[in-house]
Amino acid sequence: MAYTVIRTDLMSGTNQPADLVSLRFYDGEDKQAAVENGVIVKLEGYEDGEREVMKAVAASSTDDLNDCSIVAGVEVMYDERKRNLDEYINEAGQIVRGYIPRSRNMFSVTKEGFVGGTAPSAVGQEVGIGTDGKIDA
């Protein structure tokens, strides 16, 4: 199965650590879950007993982008049989890096980051938050 690959070099968090967060992803049943890079998550405050790790759930179209982050964990693969970035997923319970979206920041994701795996075909087409925090074109 191919997972989303994200490019973040034009995000402010690349050079400005204040625009980065540490998060742990939870599913709709409030259980720790695996999450792909490129997913937009809603930050729900710090986890109990944690000073730096925030609780995150998949964002929806009604969420305020100011309360969200874009998942972009560091692709470290412990399974030597896996060699491609599209084989990487952030495992359940893992603390993951997230980028706070700011005005004029740009990032890109592979087609797997879009709802239904369909990337926009027109230049300048508007996108939003879709199902499970994926990008909806």
Predicted segments, located by residue:
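Surface-exposed, low-hydrophobicity beta-strand/loop segments enriched in small/polar/acidic residues
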Residues: 1-137
